[in-house]
């Protein structure tokens, strides 16, 4: 709730056990799809091997941590009031890559279309049968940079590699400025 302003968008995969993604308002269908794809990737749908899921979004003003009178909300739950907008049949794909900022190696996770702007090298992943630790070791062995623990933390669940890519990332300072402007 601390990051969710009234006019921001609140994205949630339409499946129990999904993470919330908060983003500034946008009418751009491609941006909405990418945000929905990120929300879908970190949902339970990935962990159980589903390859598409619906994702809804609402304005921050429609979200409350308080239930209606006489009802109870479990810890971590929220109420959504009013009309939900849906992005249907979102493909579960996530790019996991790295970028070097000086001597520091950062692991980044992003929708596949955003990865070239954020990572030097990345893999587009889909739900699969390689456990997180095994997939992370395979990725780190190919990159020969960054740590296994950092890659494990970025993976949403059991995965397999769909494709490999290379990017030309913006400087970290530029990325930080974009997020500060939100």
Question: What are these language model-derived features?
Answer:
Residues 1-182:
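Extended, highly charged segments
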């Amino acid at each position: 709730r601390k990051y969710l302003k009234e006019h921001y968008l609140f994205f949630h995969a339409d499946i129990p056990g999904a993470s919330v993604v908060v983003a500034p308002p946008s009418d751009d269908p491609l941006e909405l799809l990418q945000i929905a794809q990120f929300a879908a990737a970190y949902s339970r749908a990935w962990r159980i091997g589903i390859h598409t899921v619906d994702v809804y979004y609402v304005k921050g003003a429609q979200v409350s941590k308080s239930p209606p009178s006489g009802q109870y909300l479990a810890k971590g739950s929220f109420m959504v009031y009013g009309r939900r907008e849906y992005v249907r049949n979102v493909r579960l794909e996530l790019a996991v890559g790295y970028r070097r900022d000086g001597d520091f190696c950062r692991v980044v996770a992003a929708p596949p279309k955003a990865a070239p702007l954020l990572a030097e090298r990345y893999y587009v992943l889909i739900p699969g049968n390689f456990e997180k630790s095994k997939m992370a070791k395979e990725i780190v062995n190919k990159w020969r940079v960054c740590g296994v623990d950092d890659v494990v933390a970025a993976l949403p669940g059991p995965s397999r590699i769909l494709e490999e890519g290379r990017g030309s990332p913006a400087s970290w300072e530029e990325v930080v400025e974009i997020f500060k402007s939100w």
